[in-house]
Amino acid sequence: MSYHLEKLNIKFIINQALIEIKNCKNIKELELIRIYWIGKNGFFSKKNKLLNILFPYEDFIKKDMLKKAYKKIKYIYFKKKQKIKNKEIKIKIFKEKIDISLPGRDVCNGSFHPISNIIRYSEKFFCSLGFSIVHGHEVENIYYNFDALNIPENHPSRTEHDTFWINENCLLRTQTSGIQIKVMESKKPPLKIISSGKVYRNDHDKTHTPMFHQLEGLMIDECIGISIVKSILYDFCYSLLGKKIKIRFRPSYFPFTEPSAEIDIMNEDGKWIEILGCGIVHPKILHNLKIDRNKYSGMAFGIGIERLAMLYYKLSDVRPLFINNLRFLKQFK
């Protein structure tokens, strides 16, 4: 498109630019029109330069008309540009709109593992009776795991068949009872503590796993007898598993308690399942820890969390609790 200076028709120029702007369909076409008409080296820029060269002190009317035409075309250009942008935004919104009539996606909430549920409930129960929670290390030395608990050197639990040894003096703890010794060393009676955590024994079948969880309890005070042990643990079992369960309290043997007992609960198949051991803290242990055994006595118990989980969730085998099968675990939400 070319226009001679002497035949400059402002109305024709404006109309021509308006037609071109009106007919463009996208930003790319509009940008080409802008460059031609009002760009740095566009139509108006060239005409102004030519007028300044030929008539530097004259023809102010034509210069003014060109300036007004330039402003008008620029205004129309920006208006058209905004219109195209708005249209593109509407198209984009339409394409990306969400159909709110469609059902939303389910939110998959996590939940506590069955083992964690039993531990949390057990801790809550004993804390309501005034027990405090303490924690210990899973790697223990031979003194706290065996010697301090009155377990002699020739005891079967010290062999490799039952215990995972790290070296001659360290092992993976076989019970959480070692924590009781550390508490009795550092604090004076009366004491009421519980401790839960992983323990390790070299045993694996449908009711045993090499790693399992225990909740250990200790109470040191005046006049603690076996009847108190039995009463507290019966209340715990009834609270967790219901009043209709059948419980058996039978004598047993543990090196660190005297007398000792075990509690069994009957499962749905009519079989007795051992869930915990308990007893009165052996006087020798109190004496070794410089606790006056004529004034104080103590009760101790160790609960098998997996056994409780089997009874609570009606499981016949403990091993599925450790295979991380979501289809199995989701049913316990």
From Swiss-Prot:
Its EC number is 6.1.1.20. It comes from the Bacteria. Binds 2 magnesium ions per tetramer. Its cofactor is Mg(2+). One of its GO terms (biological process) is phenylalanyl-tRNA aminoacylation. InterPro entries: aa-tRNA-synth_II, aa-tRNA-synth_II/BPL/LPL, Phe-tRNA-synth_IIc_asu, Phe_tRNA_ligase_alpha1_bac, Phenylalanyl-tRNA_Synthase, tRNA-bd_arm. It is found in: Cytoplasm. Its main location: cytoplasm. Mg(2+) binds at residue 258. GO terms for molecular function: ATP binding; magnesium ion binding; phenylalanine-tRNA ligase activity; tRNA binding. CDD domains: PheRS_alpha_core. Keywords: Aminoacyl-tRNA synthetase, ATP-binding, Cytoplasm, Ligase, Magnesium, Metal-binding, Nucleotide-binding, Protein biosynthesis. It catalyses: tRNA(Phe) + L-phenylalanine + ATP = L-phenylalanyl-tRNA(Phe) + AMP + diphosphate + H(+). GO terms for cellular component: cytoplasm. Belongs to the class-II aminoacyl-tRNA synthetase family. Phe-tRNA synthetase alpha subunit type 1 subfamily. NCBIfam families: pheS (TIGR00468). Tetramer of two alpha and two beta subunits. This is Phenylalanine--tRNA ligase alpha subunit.
